[in-house]
Amino acid sequence: MTRLEQIYAEKVAPELKKEFGYTSSMQIPRLSFVSLNMGLGEASNNNKLIEEAVVELTAIAGQKAVITRARKSIAAFKLREGMPVGCRVTLRRDRMWDYLDKLMNFALPRVRDFRGVPDRGFDGRGNFTLGIREHSIFPEINVDRVEHVKGMNVTIVTTATADKEGKMLLDLLGMPFKK
């Protein structure tokens, strides 16, 4: 059991049960999975960039990243169906807990002028999406070897039914929201 998972079981779940008055332990919101997505618009012209992104996202996530391809051709973007446009990885169970622990305790505090994560990334159903502008905030990335600074989207999917429940879940786990 990972550190963050233990915090969830011992502190977060009982607090959520008390706060929202759940009668069953299965009603308590929990994390389903975390999805990391790196969209690379210029990847259609540069194959080296997509390979670099896959290697870096694999290092960050601890799991092999998959190349995402264009579903439709768009002439204005010089994009053909099947061209690589980014990469993504979905984390579940222990890898998810390890990644979230690393994100909240190591990566986010390394962001320049970090004052907290804005809470406007909730989708209305308790899931939270966060944009990261520089992937170099993660400890696995060697800043000297980075050729292109890339951003990524981190989506945390929960079983919560409302934003209030999802926010409290992430807040109790240690997500540094803006005050």
From Swiss-Prot:
Coiled-coil segments on the chain, per record: none
Q: Which PANTHER family match?
A: 60S RIBOSOMAL PROTEIN L11-RELATED (PTHR11994)
UniProt lineage: Bacteria, Pseudomonadati, Thermodesulfobacteriota, Desulfovibrionia, Desulfovibrionales
The name on file for this protein is: Large ribosomal subunit protein uL5
What family classification does the UniProt entry report for this protein?
Answer: Belongs to the universal ribosomal protein uL5 family.
Instruction: Identify the InterPro entries for this entry.
Output: Ribosomal_uL5, Ribosomal_uL5_bac-type, Ribosomal_uL5_C, Ribosomal_uL5_CS, Ribosomal_uL5_dom_sf, Ribosomal_uL5_N
**The protein's role, per its UniProt record:** This is one of the proteins that bind and probably mediate the attachment of the 5S RNA into the large ribosomal subunit, where it forms part of the central protuberance. In the 70S ribosome it contacts protein S13 of the 30S subunit (bridge B1b), connecting the 2 subunits; this bridge is implicated in subunit movement. Contacts the P site tRNA; the 5S rRNA and some of its associated proteins might help stabilize positioning of ribosome-bound tRNAs.
Sorted keywords for this record are: Ribonucleoprotein, Ribosomal protein, RNA-binding, rRNA-binding, tRNA-binding
- Name any one GO molecular function: rRNA binding
